[in-house]
Regions:
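C-terminal beta-strand-rich structural cap/linker in extracellular carbohydrate-active enzymes
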Residues: 615-638
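Glycan-processing catalytic domains of CAZymes
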Residues: 85-99, 110, 124-129, 133, ...
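Active-site-proximal helices and loops of the catalytic beta/alpha 8
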Residues: 1-31, 202-240, 244-277, 282, ...
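Hydrophobic faces of well-ordered beta-strands that scaffold small-molecule active sites
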Residues: 51-53, 103-105, 164-166, 352, ...
């Protein structure tokens, strides 16, 4: 048995012993740097060499503390089984040992209990933009708020030398958002009786594509579009101002579920969201609705609708970044622009992944980024941009990195996509991209073809890719195979990858009670991740595109090969990865020709995913390396 107070107390004491006197670790990490590093205070360059761990508070630190029956996410015997910030603090030293320097969390905002897709709400169904999800408070702690506990988490991370990034969702909200009572005009509304029939219109004369100026007429002339527009109505405060005033007085500040009463009184409700891609087969986003960023349709779309048409949602309105619109809903914009700064001021967070930022109107996107940087010039933004060809655009818009599509390209080793992505596409990017074979939305690496072999391959490969930000999806390091969500590159069958007798069989963390297999970790995977920490920490700061050298490898269309030379010290690093999972391959490296490098020895850091200390023999200035099928390795030269 573990005494939780001794356990947590011991970890917290160890962290606090590392704190420097007089330093306020609740401020942004960039403000904590020594004065001699003043140039880095305004620099966001740290992002491109970050080693990032992504987690979902509710699931990553969830555990069956009662020790019997099944995990239910309950609060029993004084314990909170679902994840909490307190348990997150206990996880930080574990991440530090893995070499992690940046932690990224899925949304921590208060989520809605309505329109759930499973046992639990999605973290993206944001009920309050400024409140933290109350269930993330640990029942072991008395006299502290959930805000206190998150602040402590950020401080602990900063003490350990880690930055904290959050996910921000400025485009959608829960369909029973707390903002509805104060600002019903910030939402779209449909008649309640039409809710069952509401769905994205199918446009017969178009394929799977995005809305554009060229296809607007086709979109609006479609019969299903006309049907959809007929479902919309005015906001309830306009339908009956007096009844709304009374309803508002009865509901505001009481913390009760007001949506049912609103539907009964006015016969309206916010509609579910759907994709901005035309003819997208994915179902409606039943737990969220779009915020009304504009009071009118896009300028070019107005000719296609009746002047008396109620505000509505359609592809061109969702993809607001593609269409000019002179009717900004200014009070809503001002509110959204100040959400991130509120977290900066209260908690000292260090960056944001901007959900659906690519669909925001350019002026709003720019204002959000600018306001955050006014408070902290070192504050970073990651664009949820899956097309790496949009890297230049993301850079121009002020982002520091893009999500990218490594999760799609890397698993397709047999199709040559992994080689294409890592060898040809990444080095030329204008912005770094996250590199990982899995994300919270995709299948796990262990569930891909070649399973554990591929998971090991992808881990070593992604440690030192040019323009690649190494990203670990929580659970990867202990061999998790169950996906957290089915949103990308997956099917409904993807939820059934565990044995049927496993308590998590068929469960999805985004929507169900969920816990990792902490009691049965894959020690082989964990030891591999742990073994890379010293090398990653030592070399990450100089293994980037500024120090990338080309032309020293024998040609290969199967082996990914990159070489970095330290700009000052007598040191180089080589990453090699055989994308052929059926045959071994040789590659030779002309190390003697590397400029300004005195070769004392060439060390192979890994051999078939075992840490080694083997030095390679040179042959007329070359080294020759054989890579087993699906093997990745690292060479260091000193």
């Amino acid at each position: 048995m573990v005494n939780p107070y001794k356990y947590f107390g011991g970890i917290i004491t160890e962290i606090l012993e590392l704190a420097k006197p007089g330093v306020h670790y609740g401020k942004p990490f960039s403000s904590l740097l020594p004065l001699r590093e003043e140039k880095t205070l305004t620099s966001r360059e740290w992002m491109r060499t970050a080693y990032m761990y992504g987690f979902f508070v509710r699931a990553t630190t969830a555990y069956n503390h009662k020790g019997y029956w099944k995990f239910q996410g309950s609060r029993s015997a004084g314990y909170t089984e679902d994840g909490t910030f307190l348990k997150g603090i206990a996880l930080l030293p574990y991440l530090k040992k893995m070499g992690i320097d940046t932690v990224y969390s899925l949304p921590i905002t208060k989520y809605s209990q309505r329109f759930k897709k499973g046992e639990m709400p999605s973290p993206y169904a944001v009920k309050s933009f400024t409140e933290i999800e109350p269930s993330y408070k640990d029942s072991l702690l008395q006299g502290f708020s959930v805000e206190d506990e998150f602040a402590a988490f950020v401080e602990a991370a900063h003490i350990l030398g880690m930055r904290v990034l959050l996910d921000f969702v400025p485009r959608t909200a829960a369909r029973d958002s707390d903002l509805i009572l104060q600002h019903p005009n910030w939402f779209y509304w449909i008649r309640a009786e039409a809710a069952e029939r509401y769905q994205a219109p199918k446009i017969e004369n178009l394929g799977f594509c995005q809305p554009s100026i060229d296809n607007l007429r086709t979109i609006y002339s479609a019969p299903e579009t006309k049907r959809l527009l007929g479902y919309f109505t005015e906001s309830p405060d306009k339908l009956n101002p007096q009844v709304w005033e009374n309803f508002y007085k009865d509901s505001v500040g009481k913390g009760n579920d007001f949506l049912e009463s609103l539907i009964d009184l006015f016969g309206v409700l916010p509609p579910p969201g759907f994709s901005d891609w035309i003819n997208d087969p994915q179902p409606a986003w039943s737990d969220v609705t779009f915020l009304k960023l504009f009071l009118k349709p896009p300028n070019l779309s107005r000719e296609f609708v009746d002047p008396n048409q109620s505000p509505y949602i359609l592809f061109d309105i969702i993809k607001a970044s593609n269409f000019e619109n002179d009717s900004a809903n200014r009070p809503l914009w001002e509110y959204l622009v100040d959400v991130i700064p509120s977290y900066q001021r209260r908690f000292g967070i260090d960056g944001i992944r901007l959900d659906m930022g690519h669909a925001l109107p350019r002026a709003l996107e720019s204002a959000i980024i600018q306001k955050a940087r006014e408070l902290d010039p070192g504050f970073v933004f990651i664009a949820e941009e899956l097309e790496i060809s949009k890297d230049k655009k993301a850079l121009e818009h002020g982002y520091d990195a893009i999500l990218g599509n490594a999760w799609w390209m890397e698993p397709r080793v047999d199709e040559g996509k992994c080689y294409e992505f890592c060898q040809k596409l990444l080095p030329g990017l204008k912005l770094p991209a996250l590199v990982s074979a899995e994300t919270p939305d995709t299948p796990r690496a262990l569930a891909r073809p070649y399973q554990k072999r591929f998971a090991k391959f992808s881990f070593i490969l992604n440690l030192f890719l040019p323009n690649g930000i190494t990203f670990l999806n929580s659970g990867f390091e202990i061999g998790e195979i169950q996906p957290l969500n089915l949103g990308l590159d997956n099917t409904e069958e993807g939820r059934f990858v565990l044995p049927k007798n496993n308590p998590m069989y068929g469960k999805i963390a985004f929507f169900d009670h969920f816990t990792f297999q902490w009691d049965k970790p894959d020690d082989e995977m964990f030891q591999l991740v742990l073994s890379a920490a010293p090398l990653k920490s030592e070399c990450k700061h100089w293994c980037h595109t500024d120090n990338l050298l080309e032309g020293y490898f024998t040609p290969s269309d199967k082996i990914i090969a990159h070489l970095y030379k330290h700009p000052v010290q007598n040191q180089a690093l080589i990453i090699l990865a055989n994308t052929d999972f059926h045959s071994g391959n040789w590659i030779s490296v002309d190390v003697a020709s590397i400029p300004e490098l005195k070769i004392g020895g060439v060390k192979r850091e890994y051999e078939d995913y075992r840490k080694t200390n083997r030095y390679l023999n040179m042959d007329n200035g070359y080294i020759h390396i054989f890579l087993e099928p699906g093997e990745a390795t690292i060479l260091t030269i000193r």
